[in-house]
Amino acid sequence: MEWTRNRYRISDDKSELDLFWVVPAIQDSYWASGRSRAVIEQSIANSLTLGLYADGRQIGFARAVTDKCTFAWVCDVMVHQDYRHIGLGKWLMDCLGEHPDMADVAEQFLRTRDAHGLYEQYGYRVCDAMVRNREQA
């Protein structure tokens, strides 16, 4: 799928992803600091991904792990700092929600330390949860 707005475009085509942008962007995030390139590439291969592009250059990314009906975990939502605060993060979340793999998912989860206001606009709320963390190779 593809969405276009002026000079910006969002696509779910994994072959368009610029891994030379996506991998370091994820590795530089507070939630995935130090994550290996191999793990990031495997997570992309096994997820629904959206790339956000300005004039053909990657400036954003989001992914979701989902069974397409009951559960989805939204993660790695990011927009390059030079393109923030102009509505592109909202548009990325809109497109993710409209995607056929996500449109009918009953429960969608995410974990964040920031941007609570953005996610609350999409119906996300703080809830109790349990988590199991294991070291990755």
Predicted regions and their residues:
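Short amphipathic alpha-helix that is part of the acyltransferase structural core
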Residues: 1-35
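Short alpha-helical
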Residues: 17, 69, 114-117
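A conserved beta-strand-loop-helix scaffold within acyl/acetyltransferase catalytic domains
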Residues: 38-55, 59-78
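Conserved acetyl-CoA pyrophosphate-binding loop and the N-cap/start of the following alpha-helix
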Residues: 83-92
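Conserved active-site alpha-helix within GNAT-family acetyltransferase domains
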Residues: 90, 102-137
